[in-house]
Amino acid sequence: QSEIIEDRIKEWTMFDSTGYTLPAIPTIPGTIVPFDDPSRILDIGVNNYFTCQNAINTLRATGFVQDSWRFESGNTKFILNGGIRFHYWSFNNEFTASPRIALRILPNWKRDWSFGIKTGVFYQSPFYREMRRPDGTLNSNIKSQYSYQILGSSEYNFKMWKRPFKFTTEVYYKHLENLVSYSLDNLRITYSGENDARGYATGIDMKLSGEFIDGLESWVSLSIMKTAEDLYNDFYYTPEGELVRPGYIRRPSDQRFAFNIFFQDHVPGFRPIRV
C-alpha cells in the first residue's frame, strides 16, 4: 500500500469576548472604549499562530497467517483459531508481529450456550495526525501503539414469542503501551506526536438482539468501561513546593456508561417500507 500525504497548515487562535478580543491592551476599568481604540484590534501574538507544510510518501506491507482446529472432549466441542499478523511501515522502518489466539467452547447443554476466550497482541500504526506534533513538525521516530488484550465472552441463543433472540456478554481488559496522548477541546483533537503514555481499558458489554418485530432484527446494548493513562515523566509542584506525580488519569475517551437501542418496524399497511 502506497500513501501520499500533503499537508498545509495556517492556524490562528483568537479569543473573543464582548466588544474586544483577547489578548487585549488593558484599559482603565469602567471607561468607555471607542471603536477605534487599540484594545479592539486583534493581537494574535507569536504563541497564537503557526504555519507548516509537510509532504510524505510511504509504503506499508501487511500479511497474516491463520489456521483453525476443531476437536471434542466428551460432549463438549472446541474451536481454536490462531494466527499472527505482520506489518511494515517505511516511514519509521518499523516491523511488527501480532500473535493472536481465540478459543470457542460449545457445551452440549439443554440450552444453547457458547463461551469464548481471546487473547493477543494488537499493534496500531500511527496515522498522520498522530505523528504530527502541535507545532506542525513530524516525528520520524514515532512507534506503533500496542496493547495486550484478553477477552471472555458468552452467547445464549433462545426463542421468545416463537422468534430467535441472542444475548451476548463480553468482559475485557487491555493493557496499552506507547500511547500517543491527545487533548480534546470541543470537536478539536490535538495529538502530542510522541509515544508519551501508557494506559489500560477494562469493561463489560452486554447486548440483546432478535426479532422484536417479526422478520426484523433489532437490538439493545449496555456498556460499562473505564480507561485511564499515565503520562511519562509528568509532575507538578504544589504551592508548598511538594512534588506530585499524578499517575493514572482519565483518558479523553473514557465513557463510563453507554446505552444504545436500534429498533426496526414495518410501516402499517405497507410492509416493504421499514422505519
Question: Which residues make up each language-model segment?
Answer:
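Outer-membrane beta-barrel transmembrane domain signature of Gram-negative proteins
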Residues: 1-77, 202
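Structural signature of Gram-negative outer-membrane beta-barrels, strongest in the C-terminal barrel
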Residues: 3, 50-174, 264
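Outer-membrane beta-barrel translocator domains and adjoining extracellular loop/strand segments
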Residues: 7-15, 92-98, 128-135, 179-188, ...
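Flexible, solvent-exposed coil segments and beta strand-coil junctions
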Residues: 38-48, 77-84, 127-137, 181-190, ...
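Extracellular loop and loop/strand-boundary signature of outer-membrane beta-barrel proteins
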Residues: 47-54, 85-90, 134-141, 189-195, ...
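Transmembrane beta-barrel outer-membrane domains
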Residues: 54-60, 92-96, 141-147, 187-189, ...
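Gram-negative outer-membrane beta-barrel transporters
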Residues: 70-77, 173-175, 195-274
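Membrane-embedded beta-barrel scaffold of Gram-negative outer-membrane proteins
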Residues: 108, 144-211, 223, 228-229
